Amino acid sequence: MLQSLFKKVFGSRNERLVKQYLQKVKAINALEPAMEQLSDAELAGKTADFKARIEQGTSLDTLLPEAFAVVREAARRVLGLRHYDVQMVGGMVLHDGKIAEMRTGEGKTLMATLPAYLNALAGKGVHVVTVNDYLARRDAEWMGRVYGFLGLTTGVNLSHMPHAEKQAAYAADITYGTNNEYGFDYLRDNMVFEVGEKVQRPLAFGVIDEVDSILIDEARTPLIISGQSEENTALYQQVNLVPPRLTRQKDEESEGDYSVDEKSRQVLLSEAGHEKVEEILTEMGLLQPGGSLYDASNIMLMHHVYAALRAHALFFKDQHYVVQNGEVVIVDEFTGRLMSGRRWSEGLHQAVEAKEGVAIQKENQTLASITFQNFFRMYEKLSGMTGTADTEAFEFQSIYGLETVVIPTHRPMIRKDEHDQVYRTGRERDQAVINDVRACHERGQPVLVGTTSIEANEKLSAELKKAGLPHNVLNAKQHASEAEVIAQAGLPGAVTIATNMAGRGTDIVLGGSIQKEVDAIRNDAALADGEKDARITALKADWQTRHDAVLAAGGLHIIGTERHESRRVDNQLRGRSGRQGDPGSSRFFLSLEDPLLRIFASDRVAAIMNRLKMPEGEAIEHPWVTRAIENAQRKVEQRNFDIRKQLLEYDDVSNDQRKVIYEQRNELLASVEIGDTIRAMRYDVLGETIDQHIAPGSMDEQWDVAGLEKTLAAQFTLELPLRQWLDEDKTLNEEGLRKKILAAADAAYAEKEALVGAEGLRRFERAVMLQSLDTHWREHLSALDHLRQGIHLRGYAQKQPKQEYKREAFELFSAMLAAIKAEVTQITTTVQVRAPEDVQAVELHEEPSNVQYEHAGYDEGADFAAAESAEAAPSGPVHVGPKVGRNDPCPCGSGKKYKQCHGKLA
């Protein structure tokens, strides 16, 4: 109550911020008359003037009013579009590193030119991030005309682009590209063997379009670059025969072999199920008679069984994936788009391929990986824009430190959002949707029907065909024609069925879009200018008639056939209507069979329906029902937020390690001289080897001299007469012997340098170091994956899984660094380098075969949210000998802490 009173008196923080920005807009507007008086050359010359002032120490904030006024005038001259005051406010919000929530159709693309131009003046590069290649290309071409007019360069960064073109795109002042491509380029840059092969500059300023989709929806799906491992794929086909022979439990009390937890997307075998699976596998010859699935030797078999169960019970054709040209292609659950070239990890994709009877591709080994959360947090300054961010404002603030500012609309929003109608069955709901579509079509009102899956999309399309209603279908299968279909969805009486957010980023113009026809007439060289103008005028008059007819019919009507887990996605669907003050309406038709209602609210609503004795085909419609559904969505949103937060906390561990490895790698690439590093590593490794045979401070009688001689010869090709040295010099103590061994190793290495030359040996050292670093890092990523999958089970032992993960991940990392040190020392001391050709042979690094850019599984993170999962995880790496804590004394006996001795690389 006090809070609402405070808001009434002082206004909300959002209102106060917008008021402050509007004061700055007045200053920008005051400059407009002066800008209009400038010639094109004078206006374009402002860019050089701004850059000179920045060099003299003027801040971007000081330049903002003038720079924004320049961009507004340039856009008016080049595109015929003038930035509204609210777009100026949005531009300032983005420049300040915040998120601008701006309604659909309010001109986010044009708004982004303001902060992009201003920040590009600093010369560090600006990245505009979009959700697909089509939007990146469209926006770069469209807005690039404004930047080009003002003397700035624009690049577009697309997938499968040649290396030289990518470098040119990143060298431009402003680069447009997709979130995936920026992330993959970062990972690829950290896999190169020469500095000149890199494409990205340091990450300075990023503007993310559809920021909610990228930083929230896709935050659980890491970007993974992987190569194929040598694994037997026949096992997937054999294990695929197991799930059809098992019985699913209907509920917790009923009998069955396995249960499916839809909330956490897990499949769990019952006791009876375990026994039955063991019987089937024994019968197939995959399990030894009397063997158990829990035997250490059968861990991978267990992994295959669960992958097959998930493929059969949780992933369905035309909903989670489609089969195209003999391949299983993932459907993005948030956008409904096909994700060609992406594969689920952990053997799930192969299990789905086995289920569908298509060729099984080998399982992948992770070469590099990063989450969008950690990638985008590396930008010096980050901002975003979307039509729907307010519901997730807390998450943006807590995870990314980004404040959300709601920008007022240019014109008042008059769309009418009706209450949800809930039906008992999906059949009744579909009939109600068809009746509503028919009514809209007959009165000439365009209608957009949103579905949550391709399966529902095609099913509804078949029903509409049966009812004789003409319509356009838009889902991932029609990806190529997406923008065209959406652009014409505003024609009088048009019926369009689209999956979730297909066509996002393209406006639905009431009366249909005529831009394509206008461009065709303008570009027709056979027509005289007068004829062109006459045709365009006639075209516009015809469009105006259609536009007025649609307005009279009530504008665009939105029908939702199912509530999404997130209110934001529902708001995005609604937001397609009522753009820029246009009329419109929306309604959701639901059934008790929908996943959200079935899991969270069906019993309560069904009880109300029974109590009211509602006949078949009758819907329940009440603000209470709408509120109950929104509460269910809030619960799911909160749970998903908790999962993302948990995942981030786990991923931060590997992210810290990634930073160390990539920093080390970049230093190696940039440095010419790494001889000192190699020498320090050699001394460390030889020191450890000596310690194993001659313990520090031990008596002469305890020394294993013969064993040390043998080890030095075998591992480092150092044939040293240690016994002879000791016999000849009775005063030679442990320290003296150590010095002689290290001196002999240095002398042997100097001989190698004399043979091949200092420059050749440095190149050899660098190549060995890079390859060893990469190989061990890949193995480490795989070990971390295995550790992470089973870590939640530590909760049963009254241990904190997160703390255990941090501790073991550090131990793995320390072991990896020690292994790199040992391997590099062994290779550099044992490999015979006699000529420059030998160096070149080492430098010819083998490129990973069949590299793929992978999309991680949907169920990732469910383990952290629900420790009830009894799924056995693959065994983690085996540790030999006692584990050493980070702050414990180093076992080598140096007296230093482990982290300051053998716990670091060099």
Curated annotation (Swiss-Prot):
Q: Name one GO cellular component term.
A: plasma membrane
**Protein location:** Cell inner membrane; Cytoplasm
Q: What Gene3D superfamilies does this protein map onto? A: Helical scaffold and wing domains of SecA, P-loop containing nucleotide triphosphate hydrolases, SecA, preprotein cross-linking domain
According to the record, cofactor stoichiometry and binding are noted as: May bind 1 zinc ion per subunit.
User: What does the UniProt keyword field contain?
Assistant: ATP-binding, Cell inner membrane, Cell membrane, Cytoplasm, Membrane, Metal-binding, Nucleotide-binding, Protein transport, Translocase, Translocation, Transport, Zinc
Listed binding positions for ATP are Q87, G105, E106, G107, K108, T109, D507
Q: Which domain of life is it from?
A: Bacteria
For this protein, the Enzyme Commission number is 7.4.2.8
Q: How does the record say this protein sits in the membrane? A: Peripheral membrane protein
Write out the residues that bind Zn(2+): C890, C892, C901, H902
Question: How is this protein organized at the quaternary level?
Answer: Monomer and homodimer. Part of the essential Sec protein translocation apparatus which comprises SecA, SecYEG and auxiliary proteins SecDF-YajC and YidC.
- HAMAP family with a match to the protein in the record: SecA (MF_01382)
Report what the protein is called.
Answer: Protein translocase subunit SecA
- The organism encoding this protein is Thiobacillus denitrificans (strain ATCC 25259 / T1)
